[in-house]
């Protein structure tokens, strides 16, 4: 593995574990057992590392958010709820791998204009995907009140996506990556739960049971 890639991987791990604010370029070099000069040869300090990490993250997430959510061939799933569940799982896996961006996002957006612009664009893409997902899920709903438009529900879903990792940090619960992602998916889909049809409602109930079992396993 090339040194530049090792630097990015190590920086991501340290940022996730210790918080971006608490990690310096020298900390990253020390962890890699390389000289600070070697690190600066590849990146212009911590700012350069953050810029590269966010650029990679933005490309990956934007590509996922461009997915055709209402296409039955997407993820080979014809059931809208299963398709949405799998899509959100993949999306949240990427977000979890770069969770330091969400644990300190307001501060990062204030300090780095490129991150501010990128995060705002990603929020718009998340809202668009959430609206598609809500439209797909509510197509077979039993009854939808006039105020429960896909756009209204999408706002709540996108907000949960944007701030869930930060909420978990403040909650202080020790969850594995799988448990955290699973619960986040459940929370996002819960905004559509009151309007799901019988078949999808049964599937959602099963998802809740899976989530409960995972949490019980982690506490035992």
Spans of features found by a protein language model:
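Generic hydrophobic, amphipathic alpha-helix propensity
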Residues: 3-11, 28, 53-57, 61, ...
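Helix-turn-helix
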Residues: 6, 14-52
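Hydrophobic alpha-helical connector segments
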Residues: 52, 67-97
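Secondary-structure edge/capping motif, primarily at the C-terminal ends of alpha-helices
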Residues: 68-76, 102-109, 137, 141, ...
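Amphipathic alpha-helical segments used for helix-helix packing
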Residues: 95-117, 133-136
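Amphipathic alpha-helical packing segments from all-alpha helical-bundle domains
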Residues: 114-140, 151-166, 183-194
């Amino acid at each position: 593995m090339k040194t530049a890639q090792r630097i990015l991987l190590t920086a991501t791990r340290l940022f996730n574990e210790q918080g971006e604010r608490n990690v310096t370029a020298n900390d990253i070099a020390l962890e890699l057992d390389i000289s600070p000069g070697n690190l600066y040869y590849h990146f212009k300090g911590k700012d350069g590392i953050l810029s590269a990490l966010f650029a990679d993250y933005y490309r990956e997430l934007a590509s996922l958010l461009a997915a055709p959510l209402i296409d039955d061939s997407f993820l080979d799933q014809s059931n809208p709820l299963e398709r949405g569940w799998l899509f959100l799982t993949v999306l949240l896996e990427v977000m979890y791998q770069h969770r330091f961006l969400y644990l300190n996002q307001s501060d990062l957006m204030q300090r780095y204009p490129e991150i501010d612009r990128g995060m705002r664009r990603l929020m718009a893409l998340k809202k668009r995907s959430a609206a598609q997902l809500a439209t797909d899920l509510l197509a077979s709903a039993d009854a939808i009140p006039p105020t429960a438009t896909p756009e209204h529900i999408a706002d709540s879903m996108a907000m949960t996506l944007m701030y869930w990792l930060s909420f978990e940090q403040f909650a202080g619960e020790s969850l594995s990556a799988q448990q955290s992602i699973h619960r986040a998916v459940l929370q996002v889909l819960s905004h559509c739960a009151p309007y799901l049809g019988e078949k999808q409602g049964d599937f959602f109930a099963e998802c809740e049971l899976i989530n409960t079992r995972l949490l019980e396993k982690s506490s035992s």
